[in-house]
């Protein structure tokens, strides 16, 4: 294998149009050549790539199969290799605003990411696959079910009055579809009609967290809170995932839970 190489373009701006208001916007374009991953994009691409490519024994994809003395396929080997290309483009933003409210101060912090494209070209024989808005291999690398939503939003509102701060946080992830559909488009094949037993689409999810923090004697900080206030369930992907039937790196798998935290300042 050869080393990966990347070209990165980032453009950002910080604007303060009003007192107490700050807006930050960043555009990124990351292009990785010779990205390291499963040969041919994994078995999901090696098998159809060999078959639809004419099953030529000289085809590198077909050479991944091992045959026994009778000519029957006995094994499939998909080693780690250099992929053709991975390119990701998107926009990050953050809006922070604070203003007085009664005898306290109200703060808003809105941030998010819009994934414009996440192109994965698993080998030079097929077109790049746009993994933005998809889950599962090859978009999920080697862990089936990893979701790549186009929209991620993180919003927080807090009100500080005296020694108390009340806050509400909102998290949002847009829906995603099975990467098999994007894979078939790249292979110029019709959309799959006999998809295995798993979800073909993961619905969008909203999560709300609430907390109250008290400053005590200028040395201690007591926080009472609840995460996943509405007890929103994680999106399940059936047999496409080995980690609790969902993507625990994105979705909340624990449900509603309460917590108490104490911090002490050392002098």
Placement of each model-derived feature along the sequence:
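C-terminal beta-signal and adjacent terminal beta-strands/loops
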Residues: 22, 31-33, 116-118, 169-188, ...
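Outer-membrane beta-barrel signature, preferentially recognizing the C-terminal barrel domain
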Residues: 1-24, 76-91, 98-101, 146-150, ...
């Amino acid at each position: 294998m050869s080393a990966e190489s990347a070209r990165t373009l980032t453009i950002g701006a910080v604007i303060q149009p009003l007192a107490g208001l700050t807006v930050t916007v960043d555009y990124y374009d990351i292009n990785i050549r010779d990205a390291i991953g499963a040969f041919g994009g994994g078995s999901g691409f090696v098998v159809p790539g060999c078959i639809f490519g004419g099953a030529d024994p000289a085809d590198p994809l077909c050479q991944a199969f091992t045959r026994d003395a009778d000519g029957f396929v006995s094994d499939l080997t998909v080693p780690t290799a250099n992929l053709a290309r991975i390119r990701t483009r998107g926009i990050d933003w953050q809006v922070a605003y604070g203003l007085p409210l009664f005898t306290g101060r109200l703060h808003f912090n809105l941030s998010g990411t819009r994934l414009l494209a996440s192109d994965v070209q698993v080998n030079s024989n097929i077109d790049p696959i746009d993994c933005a808005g998809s889950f599962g291999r090859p978009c999920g690398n080697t862990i089936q079910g990893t979701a790549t939503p186009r929209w991620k939003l993180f919003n927080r509102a807090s009100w500080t009055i005296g020694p108390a701060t009340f806050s509400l946080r909102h998290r949002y992830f847009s829906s995603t579809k099975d990467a098999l559909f994007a894979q078939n488009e790249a292979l110029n094949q019709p959309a799959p009609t006999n998809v295995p037993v798993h979800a073909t689409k993961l619905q969008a999810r909203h999560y709300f967290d609430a907390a109250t923090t008290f400053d005590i004697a200028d040395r201690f900080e007591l926080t009472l809170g609840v995460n996943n206030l509405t007890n929103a369930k994680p999106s399940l992907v059936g047999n496409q995932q080995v980690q609790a039937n969902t993507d625990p790196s994105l979705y909340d798998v624990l449900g509603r839970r309460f917590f108490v935290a104490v911090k002490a300042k050392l002098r």
